[in-house]
């Protein structure tokens, strides 16, 4: 009797997963502000990986972000509601970006936590003022991916969530190209959460 454990895996085919779908949760008013492109200066400074445009590979997480973003502050604005933005990015385009990736956020992962603590602890005007992650040669990383932080002071990450942040003009060009393409297969704003 043959068991599945010993069956060979099907052959991997390049191009099967040519497109990576990224999601961003925000409000309708925020999304309208991005219609001509994303402006990094509108991003908060002290996020997990510094100032950047944050996305996820999980639609449910983007929905959560959108609902959190749309809170009681916006109740008086009738024409506003939570939305998620969908970006379809070709993986080959992502490989052209200078990227930093973290798979795990274990308590002992010093590289991950030192970056998060540095970025989360940044405040405008202090010597730690920091826009995002920098390579050894002083260049900005275009993109950073890794777990979502629940409490950076206690080194706790959320299980089952991820984030990919974009930090530079070249990274923005990739996302803005999807927005301004006018093609719904590359970019879409969804309000049916």
In which residue ranges do the predicted regions lie?
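Acidic, aromatic-lined catalytic clefts of primarily extracellular/periplasmic carbohydrate-active enzymes
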Residues: 52
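Short aromatic-glycine-(Arg/Gly/Cys) micro-motifs in beta-strand/loop hairpins
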Residues: 20, 24-46
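Conserved NAD+-utilizing ADP-ribose enzyme module
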Residues: 1-20, 47-49, 63-64, 68-193
């Amino acid at each position: 009797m043959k068991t599945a454990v010993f069956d060979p895996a099907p052959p991997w085919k390049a191009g099967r997963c040519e497109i990576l779908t990224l999601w961003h949760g925000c409000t309708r008013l925020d999304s309208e502000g991005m219609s001509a492109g994303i402006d990094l200066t509108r991003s908060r400074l002290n996020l997990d990986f510094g100032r950047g445009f944050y996305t996820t590979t999980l639609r449910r997480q983007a929905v959560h972000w959108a609902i959190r973003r749309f809170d009681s502050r916006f109740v008086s604005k009738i024409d506003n509601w939570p939305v998620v933005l969908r970006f379809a990015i070709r993986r080959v385009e992502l490989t052209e970006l200078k990227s930093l990736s973290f798979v795990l956020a274990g308590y002992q992962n010093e590289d991950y936590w030192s970056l998060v603590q540095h970025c989360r602890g940044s405040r405008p005007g202090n010597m730690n003022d920091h826009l995002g992650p920098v390579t050894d040669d002083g260049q900005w990383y275009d993109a950073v991916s890794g777990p979502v932080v629940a409490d950076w002071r206690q080194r706790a990450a959320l299980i089952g969530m991820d984030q990919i942040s974009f930090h530079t003009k070249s990274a923005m060009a990739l996302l803005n190209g999807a927005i301004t393409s006018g093609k719904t297969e590359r970019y879409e704003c969804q309000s049916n959460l």
